[in-house]
């Protein structure tokens, strides 16, 4: 993946976001942040608003209140006022829940579809080579139809497709969904390797607490559309609220 110059900076501040679907409110004043080079987890069980926040960040759901302030290299943008295309062109890319591949296209064709951001087009060959180095199985199966791959292989392809856009901020929505425990561990490990090797900034929404905390710097626990706790890994593991509401062990 073509790397950005080290002088570039990124900071995302989610402020008091209220959002939902029609009359159903899914987020109730959510605030959080992520800075350059961080990996941050949005933790919580299904139905608590994690994916809704991800969709807000991508312009797929419009907040009714609050702001999504992205600062890039000294320039500020409110993602709540931008289209999905504009957000992607800023370098924000998502690995969606359920992977959302094109099953009747080959592995390589799916990867190439990820390079639609104008800034990524000059680096298509370089990013394709990067993906084949990072995910050898994709190179081995580059002519195979995506729909015929295993769930774990499809997850790797979904991550690779996102990396083809040379993202500044990578959103990963529920990477463990539909995968066996072994494949979940493999996927999380790969995200960790990519972060450490290339300095990616990653926001991961994940219900699997124990896997997520392996790779993150900080985390936020969201319950019923509200952030109820935030902290580093040590505080997440030791906090009674997290144990009670998420782990059920307090």
Where are these regions (language model features)?
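ABC-type ATPase nucleotide-binding domains, specifically the catalytic core motifs of the NBD
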Residues: 22, 40, 107-126, 134-139, ...
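Conserved structural motif at the start of ABC-family nucleotide-binding domains
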Residues: 12-14, 27
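Helix-to-loop junction immediately C-terminal to a conserved catalytic motif
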Residues: 58
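Helical segment within the ABC ATPase nucleotide-binding domain
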Residues: 185-199
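The feature captures the beta-strand-to-loop junction immediately N-terminal to the Walker
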Residues: 43-45
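ABC ATPase NBD Q-loop/coupling interface
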Residues: 67-88, 233
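ABC ATPase C-loop
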Residues: 162-163
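Conserved catalytic motifs of ABC-family nucleotide-binding domains
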Residues: 166
């Amino acid at each position: 993946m073509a790397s950005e110059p080290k002088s570039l900076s990124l900071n995302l501040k989610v402020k008091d976001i209220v959002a939902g679907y029609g009359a159903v409110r899914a987020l109730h004043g959510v605030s959080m942040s992520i800075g350059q080079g961080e990996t941050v987890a949005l933790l919580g069980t299904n139905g608590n608003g994690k994916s809704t926040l991800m969709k807000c960040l991508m312009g797929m759901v419009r907040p009714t209140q609050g702001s999504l302030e992205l600062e890039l290299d000294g320039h500020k943008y409110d993602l709540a006022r931008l289209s999905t295309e504009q957000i992607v062109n800023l370098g924000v890319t998502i690995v969606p829940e359920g992977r959302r591949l094109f099953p009747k296209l080959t592995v390589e064709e799916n990867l190439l579809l990820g390079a639609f951001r104008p800034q990524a087009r000059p680096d298509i060959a370089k990013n394709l080579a990067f993906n084949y180095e990072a995910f050898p199985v994709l190179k081995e199966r580059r002519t195979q139809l995506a729909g015929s791959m295993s769930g774990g292989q499809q997850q790797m392809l979904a991550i690779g497709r996102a990396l083809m856009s040379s993202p500044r901020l990578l959103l990963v929505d529920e990477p463990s969904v539909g995968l066996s425990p072994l494949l979940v561990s493999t996927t999380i490990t790969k995200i960790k390797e990519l972060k450490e090797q290339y300095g990616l900034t990653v926001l991961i929404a994940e219900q699997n607490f124990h896997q997520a905390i392996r790779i993150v710097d900080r985390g936020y626990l969201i319950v019923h559309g509200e952030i109820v706790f935030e902290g580093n890994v040590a505080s997440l593991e030791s906090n009674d609220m997290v144990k009670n509401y998420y782990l059920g062990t307090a």
